[in-house]
A protein has these predicted regions:
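An N-terminal hydrophobic leader/cap segment in hydrolases
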Residues: 1-63, 69-76
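Conserved alpha/beta-hydrolase
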Residues: 103-126
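A conserved short beta-strand
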Residues: 178-182
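Short coil/turn segments at beta-strand junctions that form active-site/ligand-binding loops
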Residues: 83-84, 110-111, 154-155
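Catalytic nucleophile-loop/oxyanion-hole region of alpha/beta-hydrolase
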Residues: 92-98, 122-152
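Short glycine-enriched nucleophile-adjacent loop
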Residues: 165-177
Length: 182
């Protein structure tokens, strides 16, 4: 695991308090992050606005099926001529907090980044690490993409690790995408 500190810190946040304060994802509405959310981001190295002060960080939830899915969005300024948005889909038993290095690399390469916690993982709702059917993951991806479509830059790229990769492949195969549209 990757921490940005030399010592292990005791988390200065409570998951239930964070969930109670989550608001709908809307990058058009700037919001001050609660101290506990800043502590959460710092603990997992997601506070990339410290290393990239030009980046604007947005977070909130998206209604996806029967779940509230936590979305993290890192947006570069127009002056950087962003190349699009990279979606990051994590694996089983993971959450976005494990991908700070990948997010950092994508930002450094000129991409905005959107990552979300799968249902039952991280700060998303749902029974921990459980899903009724794998097709639910595909539905969540579809709902997240539909919700953010008018709000995040295109073109879109995607990276999926383990279960996240399977979700992407399943989505592309199930929705009859061609090489040009995938």
């Amino acid at each position: 695991m990757y921490w940005k500190t030399d010592t292990i810190e005791i988390p200065d946040w409570d998951r239930h308090s964070l969930l109670d304060r989550l608001e709908p994802f809307d990058p058009a509405t700037p919001r001050e992050l609660a101290d506990q959310m800043v502590a959460y981001c710092r603990f997992y190295g997601l506070d990339l606005w410290v290393e990239h002060p030009e980046v604007v960080y947005h977070q909130g939830y998206v209604e996806a099926g029967r779940h509230q899915v936590m979305v993290h969005y890192y947006r570069l300024p127009e002056s950087f001529t962003p190349r699009g948005t990279v979606f990051i889909l994590h694996g089983y038993f993971d959450h976005v907090g494990l991908y700070s290095q990948l997010i950092d690399r994508c930002l450094g390469a000129g991409f905005d980044v959107l990552a979300y916690d799968q249902p039952g993982h991280g700060l998303s709702s749902g029974t921990p690490a459980a899903i009724g059917s794998f097709i639910e993951y595909q539905g969540v991806l579809s709902d997240v993409m539909a919700h953010v479509q008018p709000k995040v830059r295109q073109p879109w790229f995607a990276v999926g690790q383990s279960t996240g990769g399977a979700i992407l492949i399943d989505y592309l195969l199930s929705n009859s995408h061609s090489q040009e549209t995938s």
